[in-house]
């Protein structure tokens, strides 16, 4: 198995979460992780579960097509979805290799009404968080999950668990 992973993002949180997730599963391999910019082909703020999953699939696919010299390509897409008057936040992780594809979703949490109001006005989640909580560039840091949990769950941890779950087909090739 090769050791190069292309992450379809230059966000340091997503790159680090990918490295940590792969290290948990493949502790005997030293992975080289490289973040690249590729389009998601979905809206800047995906507003449904399906759109968010599609964004992660598209990112992984574009990474593979644009940077074919790797063992794995990873797409991570954060999204939100309305549930009645409330709004939940989550992310999808898609891992592609030449042999298999793995997909998993992070845990889900509900956003506070002030953040929801700004999203309904057209702001992205990260921008809404910055306004409501007085932060700057929170989406490159611990994001909404870190802010709302007081960093009990930081954004890296939030992604790592789903990264491991997305690797299930690679760990169980004989049944996937």
Task: Describe each PLM feature range.
Residues 2-69:
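N-terminal polybasic phosphate/anion-binding patch
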């Amino acid at each position: 198995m090769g050791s190069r992973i292309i992450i379809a993002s230059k966000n340091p949180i997503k790159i680090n979460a990918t490295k940590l997730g792969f290290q948990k599963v493949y502790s005997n391999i030293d992975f080289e992780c490289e973040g690249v910019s590729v389009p998601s082909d979905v809206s800047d703020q995906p507003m449904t579960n399906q759109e968010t999953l599609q964004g992660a699939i598209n990112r992984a696919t574009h990474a593979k097509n644009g940077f074919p010299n790797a063992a794995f390509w990873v797409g991570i897409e954060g999204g939100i979805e309305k549930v009645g008057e409330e709004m939940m936040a989550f992310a999808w992780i898609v891992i592609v290799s030449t042999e298999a594809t793995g997909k998993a979703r992070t845990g889900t949490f509900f956003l506070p009404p002030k953040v929801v109001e700004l999203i309904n006005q057209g702001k992205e989640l990260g921008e809404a968080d910055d306004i409501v909580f007085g932060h700057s560039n929170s989406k490159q840091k611990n994001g909404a999950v870190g802010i709302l949990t007081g960093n009990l769950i930081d954004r890296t941890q939030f992604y790592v668990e789903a990264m491991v779950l997305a690797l299930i087909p690679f760990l169980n090739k004989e049944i996937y």
